[in-house]
Amino acid sequence: MNNVQKKPEIIVFAGPNGSGKSTFTEILRPPQMDYINADEIKKNLKCDDLEAAQLAERQRETYLSDKRDFCFETVLSTSRNLDLLKRAQEMGYFIRCYYVLTIDPMINVYRVKARVASGGHDVPEEKIYARYDRAIVLVPKVVAVSDICHIYDNSEEEPFRIFKKRKNLYFYDECVDWQRAKIGTLTGISDMERKDLNHRV
């Protein structure tokens, strides 16, 4: 009989505005896991952005206190949600991160404009650039706090996984825009093994 208790788990979909996090969330979010999302709260309760963000934050804190599984999306351009993940780690949570970025914030600006044209929510251009820069700087801390971390470059039509952390082993895969040195600078990891992370034929 197995008496090992499963750790509570957080799945976080992170990355700058316009990188394509929501698409990853739709595909990879476990249907049985509660999803805490400010945009959905805003839509369901018809409240403003600030109230939705505050409600989402309170909900995450409640789940954390109760040691319940949950997943959420975040730009992770400030330390607020990073601090939440650190506290979760200290409480014994298993943290799985899917980090989605692009090679150039201009791509993010274009995608947000396309999203707005289709009826989606807007983010001011200057905020996209500022958050992109702040988010990229925090990537090493995201990698450090995660038990499993996948980083995808989503600049092209097909996402390309450039990095994977699992059980304190680190793997990378190169493409035109991302070579080992650049991936090392992004993640803060120098001791990485090259591996086909994209199942190319």
Regions found by a protein language model. Name each.
Residues 16-17:
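The conserved Walker
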Residues 24-70:
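Conserved substrate/cofactor phosphate-moiety recognition/catalytic segment
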Residues 21:
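Conserved lysine of the Walker
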Residues 37, 74, 99-101:
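Residue-level recognition of beta-strand->loop/alpha-helix junctions
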Residues 1-7, 63-64:
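Phosphate-binding P-loop
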Residues 141-201:
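NTP-dependent small-molecule kinase module
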